[in-house]
From Swiss-Prot:
Activation/inhibition comment: Inhibited by ribitol, L-arabitol and dulcitol. Isomerization of L-xylulose to L-xylose is inhibited by xylitol.
Entry note: cofactor: Can also use Co(2+).
Activity's thermal dependence: Optimum temperature is 50 degrees Celsius with L-xylulose as substrate.
Subunit architecture: Homohexamer.
Gene: fucI
Source organism per UniProt: Escherichia coli (strain K12)
Recorded GO MF terms: arabinose isomerase activity; identical protein binding; L-fucose isomerase activity; manganese ion binding
The name this protein goes by in its record: L-fucose isomerase
Family per record: Belongs to the L-fucose isomerase family.
Active site: 337, 361
Pfam families from the UniProt entry: Fucose_iso_C (PF02952), Fucose_iso_N1 (PF07881), Fucose_iso_N2 (PF07882)
Any one of the GO CC terms: cytosol
Taxonomy, superkingdom: Bacteria
Induction of its expression: By L-fucose.
Length: 591
């Protein structure tokens, strides 16, 4: 089957069409702006899969309707998913703009004095606003000389932020969310909302009963040679933690081996269901070999599967990580308990950064006073105002141990194309696999256990659906915190010492939901959240505005908030603007 091509960025150089001197004097400068923009984006960006980003430049500068139509025909044939219009001069506003209603679009008007690029920018944005097709404005802070071909830092920041978010929008469109199972333990996020996926993300939902996973395992609809490779890899790399179950619930070596085998099979089969596997066609399973074109998935597990079969912890942890028995590779997005809304936050984070995502329960707020009472330890540094215990039953990406290193030697989680095999091995070495707690998981399984290194910048996110309003996004930038080992042990054992932990300290602003750490916990909209490496809340805000998802909670500096220019016409408070604009324009794909 033909591989689906990746979305490209379209660059639209627009120009003053008056001949006999005006257009001729601007052709080279205008096209050079387009080429410089394309060079920047191809150098600085990659798709989440690691592939290079491609830009498509209009064959000619665009002065009016005819050239705009020719450009659109070219873009339509080359899978252009977002566009950037560039110009150093006056052009004819509504005659030259990109009119595709669902394609993210930005306009860079050169800040120069010789020709009025800013005037075109304002005129074109006015046309976008009047026609109900929002666009992003890019205008440099400082005047440049006409022959200055450099891209100022503030312009570069906006170009890259727009492009990252726009590529995420284009990459999600037309894909599916694989809902493997149904509602897990009444968790609202696993009540999968087809309208949300279709109208806001341009995605479909593929609903598959968990018996399909059972069928694939029982009928050997998988690559048996790969299973042996996976088992050998686990034998080499897995360190096992203590079994905290009562004696009558502990498994012998043969039973434990069977649980491990099925856990690895679950990972293989869920992966094959998401993306397909040509090797299944070789064994006569052509239909199954195609997969479901899923860019994200969720596995219900509890309780209809886990009361009888091994839980999804091992499968989900491996799939969400940037490596497995095949080496370093792009992480998958698989949501625990089929929490599709947390899955969407994971998907957004992965598309924006190319990194693995850490799925976690937002479990406990620990005040400084409570920690001192329980452990005798006084919190300081990043943790001085209290911390949130992010912990779940073992499905977090193993990258979350932060045993990878940035260029300065600091702990981090890298895009998968930058991860060495040694770093992958270090993450595995930092992880223990603990037998699942029988009270929770009667069918057994293994939960990964690691502790995230401290001092690492993270962004925690979550999508929620509010009746009468629609989807909203929550964002909390902060840092992981490292506690003294004895303090961690005391706190961790009060919850579950067989699961992975991140101690998280959000950055406080002193007002609203970020008045203090307690307020962050109190305002979090659900029981789950996602950690994405870095302080990337601004990218999430831009992406959300493209999809028309308002942000109900964030601690991003106001100067970094970047939304379409029309948002400014929806009031003077930027967060109120966001709600009114999203309501006014409605979901991007308006179903």
């Amino acid at each position: 089957m033909k591989k689906i091509s990746l979305p490209k960025i379209g660059i639209r150089p627009v120009i003053d069409g008056r001949r006999m001197g005006v257009r001729e004097s601007l052709e080279e400068q205008t096209m050079n702006m387009a080429k410089a923009t394309a060079a920047l984006l191809t150098e600085k960006l990659r798709h989440a899969c690691g592939a290079a980003v491609e830009c498509v430049i209009s064959d000619t500068c665009i002065a009016g309707m005819a050239e705009a139509a020719a450009c659109e025909e070219k873009f339509s044939s080359q899978n252009v998913g977002l566009t950037i219009t560039v110009t150093p001069c006056w052009c004819y506003g509504s005659e030259t703009i990109d009119m595709d209603p669902t394609r993210p679009k930005a306009i860079w008007g050169f800040n120069g004095t010789e020709r009025p690029g800013a005037v075109y920018l304002a005129a074109a944005l006015a046309a976008h606003s009047q026609k109900g097709i929002p666009a992003f404005s890019i205008y440099g802070h400082d005047v440049q000389d006409a022959d200055d071909t450099s891209i100022p830092a503030d312009v570069e920041e906006k170009l890259l932020r727009f492009a990252r978010a726009g590529l995420a929008v284009a990459s999600m469109k037309g894909k599916s969310y694989l809902s493997l199972g149904g509602v897990s333990m009444g968790i609202a996020g696993s009540i999968v909302d087809h309208n949300f996926f279709e109208s806001w993300l341009g995605m479909k939902v593929q609903a598959v009963d968990m018996t399909e996973l059972r069928r694939r395992i029982d009928q050997k609809i998988y690559d048996e040679a790969e299973l042996e490779m996976a088992l050998a890899w686990a034998d080499k790399n897995f360190r096992y933690g203590e079994d905290e179950n009562n004696k009558q619930y502990q498994r012998n070596a043969e039973q434990s081996r069977a649980v491990l085998r099925e856990s690895l099979l679950m990972a293989m089969c869920i992966r094959d269901m998401m993306q397909g596997n040509s090797k299944l066609a070789d064994i006569g399973r052509v239909e199954e070999s195609l997969g479901y074109n899923a860019i994200a998935a969720g596995f219900q597990g509890q309780r209809h599967w886990t009361d009888q079969y091994p839980n999804g912890d091992t499968a989900e942890a491996i799939l969400n990580s940037s490596f497995d028995w095949n080496g370093v590779r792009e992480p998958f997005v698989v949501a625990t308990e089929n929490d599709s809304l947390n899955g969407v936050a994971m998907l957004m984070g992965h598309q924006l950064t190319g990194t693995a995502q850490v799925f976690a329960d937002v479990r406990t707020y620990w005040s400084p006073e409570a920690i001192e009472r329980v452990t005798g330890h006084k919190l300081d540094g990043l943790a001085e105002h209290g911390i949130i215990h992010l912990i779940n039953s073992g499905s977090a990406a193993l990258d979350g141990s932060c045993k990878q290193r940035d260029s300065e030697g600091n702990p981090t989680m890298k895009p998968h194309w930058e991860i060495s095999q040694q770093e992958a091995d270090a993450c595995l070495a930092a992880t223990e696999w603990c037998p699942a707690i029988h009270e929770y998981f009667r069918g057994g399984g293994y939960s990964s256990r690691f502790l995230t290194e401290g001092g690492v910048p993270f962004t925690m996110t979550r999508v929620n659906i509010i009746k009468g309003l629609g989807p909203v996004l929550q964002i909390a930038e902060g840092w992981s915190v490292e506690l003294p080992k004895d303090v961690h042990d005391i706190l961790n054992k009060r919850t579950n010492s067989t699961w992975p932990t991140t101690w998280f300290a959000p950055r406080l602003t002193g007002k609203g939901p970020f008045t203090d750490v307690y307020s962050v916990m109190a305002n979090w909209g659900a029981n789950h959240g996602v950690l994405t490496i870095g302080h990337v809340g601004a990218d999430f805000i831009t992406l959300a505005s493209m999809l028309r998802i308002p942000v109900c909670m964030h601690n991003v500096e106001e100067t970094k908030v970047y939304r379409p220019s029309a948002w400014a016409a929806h009031g003077m408070d930027i967060e109120g603007q966001d709600y009114r604009a999203c309501q006014n324009y409605g979901p991007l794909y308006k179903r």
